[in-house]
C-alpha cells in the first residue's frame, strides 16, 4: 500500500510543498527568510485575533481599550507587544528576503517576483493601518499626513482623500474602516503567499551560484525542515528579547498620548520600517513628485528583471556589482536615519543626495556594471 501522504488529495499538496520537494543542496541561510515570513504572518494573525477580541474601533474608546488590554487582560501586554514588535520582525525578514532576491538574481522568476512585490505593498498597507488603530498622537497624525498625500493626485485628489476619510478629517469613520481593512488584509496576504509559493514550485528554488541545480537536488525534509526550525528559534529568541526587555524600543513615545487633533507633534514620522520611503518622499519639494518617488521607491523592484544586463544571474562572481549592491544597502540605512530626523540643514541635503543615489544605483550604475563585467569576462564578442 502506498504512503497516504503521497495519495491523499490534501496531504499530497503538503507533501509536494514541504516534504518531498526537491531543493538545491547548496542554499544558504539567506533562503530561511521565506519560512520565517510565514511564521511571522501566523504569529501576527494569532496575536491580532486575540487583540481584536478586546479592541474597540471607536475614537472615544480605542486608546483606552489598548490600555485595558495591557493592564487588565491576562497576558494582554504580552500579546500586544508581540504583535507590535512582531511587525518589526516581519519587516526585518521582508527586507532581508528582498535583499537576498536582489543579490542572487531571484527576480528572474518573474511571476514569483511580481507577486512578492504585490505582497510587499500589501504588508506595508496593513502595517500602516495597524499603526493607526491605538489612536495615539502619532497614529492620528501619521494617518492624517499619509492619507493627505493622495490629495496630490490631479483633479480627483481632494475628493479621493475625503472618500477614504469618510468625512472632512481623520475621524471615527476612518478608524472603523482601517480596523476592518487591517483585519482582512492578512488573510489576503496569506492567500497571496500561497500563490507566491505555487509559482516558486513551478520553477524550483534559485541558489547562491545562480546556476541550474537540477543535477544536485535533495529532499526538503529533513534537511531544510530542521534548518528552518533553527531559523525560527533564533527569530523567536530575538523577538522575545525585544518583547520582554525592550518592548518600546522601536515605538514612538508620542503614541502613549491620546490622539488630539488640536495639537500637532513636533516631528511626525512613521514606524522605522517606512523611514527610508518617508525620507525619499520628503526629499522632493513638490507634493506630487514626492508621492510618485515614494511609490516608485518600492515599485522599482518590479523593474529589476528588465534592468538585468549581465549574462550571470547571481552577484556571487560579480565584484563590481557587489560593491554597488552594498553601497545601496548603506544608502538605504542612511535614508532610514534621515527619515527620522527633523527637516533642517544638513538633513535635507543628505536626504536628497541619498534619494538620488538610491535611484541612480538601481537604474543606471548596476545595469552598466553588468555590461562591464561581461566585457571583462569576454562573454561579449
UniProtKB/Swiss-Prot annotation:
Name the positions where a ubiquinone binds.
201
InterPro entries given in the database record: Cyt_b/b6_C, Cyt_b/b6_C_sf, Cyt_b/b6_N, Cytb/b6-like_sf, Cytochrome_b, Cytochrome_b_C_euk/bac, Cytochrome_b_N_euk/bac, Di-haem_cyt_TM
UniProt cofactor(s): heme b
Which residues are listed as membrane-spanning? 28-53, 82-107, 112-130, 180-200, 224-246, 289-307, 319-339, 349-370
Top-rank taxon = Eukaryota
Give yes or no: UniProt keyword Metal-binding. yes
Q: What is its main location?
A: mitochondrion
Q: Which GO terms describe its cellular component?
A: membrane; mitochondrial inner membrane; mitochondrion; respiratory chain complex III
Q: Which PANTHER family match?
A: CYTOCHROME B (PTHR19271:SF16)
| Identification of the protein by name | Cytochrome b
Origin species, per record, is: Mus musculus (Mouse)
The gene name on file is Mt-Cyb
Amino acid at each position: 500500500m502506498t504512503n497516504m501522504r503521497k495519495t491523499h488529495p490534501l496531504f499530497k499538496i503538503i507533501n509536494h510543498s514541504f516534504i518531498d520537494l526537491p531543493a538545491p543542496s547548496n542554499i544558504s541561510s539567506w533562503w530561511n527568510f521565506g519560512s520565517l515570513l510565514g511564521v511571522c504572518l501566523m504569529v501576527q494573525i494569532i496575536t491580532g485575533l486575540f487583540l481584536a477580541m478586546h479592541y474597540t474601533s471607536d475614537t472615544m474608546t480605542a486608546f483606552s481599550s489598548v490600555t485595558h488590554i495591557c493592564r487588565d487582560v491576562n497576558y494582554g501586554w504580552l500579546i500586544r507587544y508581540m504583535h507590535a514588535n512582531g511587525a518589526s520582525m516581519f519587516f526585518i525578514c521582508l527586507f532581508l528576503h528582498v535583499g537576498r532576491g536582489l543579490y542572487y538574481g531571484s527576480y528572474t522568476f518573474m511571476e514569483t517576483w511580481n507577486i512578492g512585490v504585490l505582497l510587499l505593498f500589501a504588508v506595508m498597507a496593513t502595517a500602516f493601518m495597524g499603526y493607526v488603530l491605538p489612536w495615539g498622537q502619532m497614529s492620528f497624525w501619521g494617518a492624517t499626513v499619509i492619507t493627505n498625500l493622495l490629495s496630490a493626485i490631479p483633479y480627483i485628489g481632494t475628493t479621493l482623500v475625503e472618500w477614504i476619510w469618510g468625512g472632512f478629517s481623520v475621524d471615527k469613520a476612518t478608524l472603523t474602516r482601517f480596523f476592518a481593512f487591517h483585519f482582512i488584509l492578512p488573510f489576503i496576504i496569506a492567500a497571496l503567499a500561497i500563490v507566491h509559493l505555487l509559482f516558486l514550485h513551478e520553477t524550483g528554488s534559485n541558489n547562491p551560484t545562480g546556476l541550474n541545480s537540477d543535477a544536485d537536488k535533495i529532499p526538503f525534509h529533513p534537511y531544510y525542515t530542521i534548518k528552518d526550525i533553527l531559523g525560527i528559534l533564533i527569530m523567536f529568541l530575538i523577538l522575545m528579547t525585544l518583547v520582554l526587555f525592550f518592548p518600546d524600543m522601536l515605538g514612538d513615545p508620542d503614541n502613549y498620548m491620546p490622539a488630539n487633533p488640536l495639537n500637532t507633534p513636533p516631528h511626525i514620522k512613521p514606524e522605522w520600517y517606512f523611514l527610508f520611503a518617508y525620507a525619499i518622499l520628503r526629499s522632493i519639494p513638490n507634493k506630487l513628485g514626492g508621492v510618485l518617488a515614494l511609490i516608485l521607491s518600492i515599485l522599482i523592484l518590479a523593474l529589476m528583471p528588465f534592468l538585468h544586463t549581465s549574462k550571470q544571474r547571481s552577484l556571487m562572481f560579480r565584484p563590481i556589482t557587489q560593491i554597488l549592491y552594498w553601497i545601496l544597502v548603506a544608502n538605504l540605512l542612511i535614508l532610514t536615519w534621515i527619515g527620522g530626523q527633523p527637516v533642517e540643514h544638513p538633513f535635507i541635503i543628505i536626504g536628497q543626495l541619498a534619494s538620488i543615489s538610491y535611484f541612480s544605483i538601481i537604474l543606471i550604475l548596476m545595469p552598466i556594471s553588468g555590461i562591464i563585467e561581461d566585457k571583462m569576462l569576454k562573454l561579449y564578442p
